[in-house]
Amino acid sequence: MALTEGISELLLSKPVVLGLAACALLFLIGRAFEPTVDALEPPMLRPSIPIFGHFYSMMKDQEAFFKRLDKKYHMPIATVPILKYKMYAITDPILVQSAYCNKNLSFTPFAINGAQKVTGFDDDYHKVLMETNVLPEYFKSLYDGTTAQHIHQLNVTSLKHVSQHINSIQENGMTIDNTYLWLRNLMTVATCEALYGPDNPIRSDSLVEDIWTFETGLAYLFFHIFNSKTLQRTKEARRRIQLALGKWCTNMRQDDERVSAYIRNRVGILRNYGVEGQKLGDIEVGLIHVPTSNSIPTLFWFFMHVFTRPDVVEQMRAEVEHIVQRGPDETVTVNIDDILERCPLMISAYREASRLCNGFTCNRIVMEETTITDRHGRSYLLKKGSSVKMPAGVMHASQEVWGEDAAVFRADRFLDKGLTSEQAKLRRAALTPFGGGAHMCPGRNFATAEIYGFMTALLLGYNVEPVDGKWDAFKPPPMATCPQSTSVCKPEDEASVCGTRLIRRSGWEGAQWKFVSGKVTE
């Protein structure tokens, strides 16, 4: 009796009553703001905290938010209420491919809204975007600038910069204090050399650092409400890059074929719409991180997964040794096309590294009411105005798709035999590091060719060893969560990544590396 009275008094006490009332009110408000879901739409996953729960979790956990939802509910598609809006989260590979092929799902609204936040361009240019045909022409120019011939030229120019670096390594070798920062800085300049030509504005260590400060702060530019110090550093780095690009764009001649078509085409489109001088640099900054922020961390993880496994190194060396041409003057020529055609283990190992580190979240807006269909023939209704997110990291980690060892690097995974047609189809659909559909990354072949060429030279020409000789500590570092503003995870602590020592291999002491791609040579 006393216990019952005590409980009654507790429940009737003012703080408890107010707390219960607040919870009830929050619940009712949450239901009032909650978007309605049609019976044909994907089922709704309500947040544990009404209204703000999913939004807060997604901002805090980024791509890991979707992995947690998948682990808890394991649904192929779901409606996730974000504040008062609908977001469809798709994690089934076949549904994702159905969405990529659906013309009623568009990336363009994200491009317009995100571009102004990322670049900070003024309202006058935003008006040009909204009222002219510049955006479709701009997107088309990106694909026109990455046709096979243009990609071959990008490959050779970028790898020429790489070869100058590794050709300079003497017989006593080279010690690298931080493997990640070495690869990051080397390949950032190499990529920009290929894009911007002999007057490349991104050569100084300070501007390279600015590119990565800008890239790291992209999420803060999108929301402007978190961490003002990081936001301020990001804006300052962005401005320095914009000034360098603005000066370069002002002086760039439209007929200068030493500049990549990828850049010339899009600058030409903007000039046709009256954008000149510094404004070109202000806009160009919005894409400068694209060819670096994903391919370079991928190279790092590929490098670490391969060179920390001596057995994989030996297998890959045996494969690539047959595709190089050794000249009488110590020149060693690597043809990128031969790697693509004759080095299946190299390609498999790269895809495996990409699968493990890539957490790309693809965004679309539903422009008109439409449906997408899964492998069992079931269709789901998607309502106009809703957003769609397709987190590749969930598919890349799926044990259903990749097997029980999905979390483990296995260099030959993409050479697996004996898969059923259904398993093979699922794997093809599930690997989406470059997105898909009309907006698949136009520079994907450039990104992979850079990596294949560089790794071939390292495998054949150099022994890659831990600086201190401790092989047990020479391993891939812990991986950070992938932010939704980029696609590839970085090391959790970039500054503490292990060092590497490169020593020329016996028989390759004087090798001078050259690269060929298609009919393009250095």
Curated annotation (Swiss-Prot):
Q: Which Pfam families match?
A: p450
**Which species is the source of this protein?**
Gibberella zeae (strain ATCC MYA-4620 / CBS 123657 / FGSC 9075 / NRRL 31084 / PH-1) (Wheat head blight fungus)
Alphabetized CDD domains for the sequence: CYP7_CYP8-like
Choose one Gene Ontology CC annotation of this protein and give it: membrane
Q: Which coenzyme or cofactor does it need?
A: heme
The record, for InterPro entries, names: CYP450_monoxygenase_sec-met, Cyt_P450, Cyt_P450_CS, Cyt_P450_E_grp-IV, Cyt_P450_sf
Q: Which PROSITE patterns match?
A: CYTOCHROME_P450
| Membrane-protein topology | Single-pass membrane protein
Name of this protein: Cytochrome P450 monooxygenase FGSG_08207
Q: GO MF annotations for this entry?
A: heme binding; iron ion binding; monooxygenase activity; oxidoreductase activity, acting on paired donors, with incorporation or reduction of molecular oxygen
The answer on whether this UniProt entry bears the keyword Transcription regulation reads no
